Amino acid sequence: MGNKVREFMTHREPDEHIWVERDEDGLIGTVRAGQRPMPRIRVFDLLESHPGGSQALVWDGETLRIAAEQVKGREPGLTRAADYDLIFFQFSGASAIESEYGSIELEPGDVALIPAGIAHRTTGKGECLRLRAMSKGAVNLGVDAEKPLTETRFNVSHSEPLSAHNGAGADENGRLLEHITFWDPTSDLWIERRAAELVGCVKEGGRGLKKLRAFDYFTGMTGKGGARAPVLYTGEEFRIDVYNLEGQQRGFHRGLDEDEVWFQFRGHAVNDTEWGIVELDPGEMSYVPRGIAHRINGGKGFLRMVFYTRHLIHPKAFNSSAGKKTSFTVE
């Protein structure tokens, strides 16, 4: 008999935790057959070798897509996601976002929701690297944007920074193209607009534009049985929460009706899973397919963002597609 550990099984509906006792050695590397192994993806290393060099789709599902992207200077046109919500999570550099709701600026660790139907464009500052999450279903705030519990600032440095050179976009008063995008891209449209007439033009209604400091809502250390992970955004099929676990998680978790997509923001992580041990460093991603037991061993300063989806999601890019291997330091 091996070391006895606890495992908790969860469903999104009903919201329940079922605790069981198992042998630890039966929960690490014991998958013998299956079609959804867990990759370790250096998502920003994909950009240099990806066509166009600015965006790489990393995860693709029926109701959720996640891409890694670099914004080099001012985007040449506007974008309006017609029938899906956008969430931007800033990893390095900064994003100055102009939209029909007004303007905000994202720094490392900040996240913002662009509601469906709202035109926007970004000016990237420094090495502007971020995640773009696309949710087919409507998403709402899970925390109060005006009431973070702490005020944390981050400095992110890259071992081999990507080139940030880009030709300037259209003049502020000039005309440019607005790309109206749809979940099914065969419906996409390009319409000529005057940018100055769109920025801040919404007078009332809708969900607005607010940024969150993603890692400033912790009430304690997550994963130890006390403080719960703050839920930043939530919808019927999708949610985002964050974790700050240092040390070993209280028990193994087995989510039975959701896939989990992990983004490691800071610190090293050793993840014990039935697929084996998966390690992650800052700027890397993996996922846990539904039904797989897993346990986090978080290193010093561990911070992670997790995207949950009730529909299947699949990796669309792998390290074999990356032209080089780089690393990040987050302080």
Residue positions per predicted region:
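Short strand-coil-strand connectors
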Residues: 62, 98-102, 125, 272-276, ...
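A short, N-terminal "cap"/entry segment at the start of jelly-roll beta-barrel domains
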Residues: 1-68, 75-78, 150-241, 331
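Short acidic-glycine-tyrosine-enriched beta hairpin
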Residues: 100-117, 274-292
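Ligand-binding loop in jelly-roll beta-barrel domains
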Residues: 116-147, 290-316
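A hydrophobic/aromatic-rich effector-binding and dimerization subdomain
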Residues: 129-173, 318-330
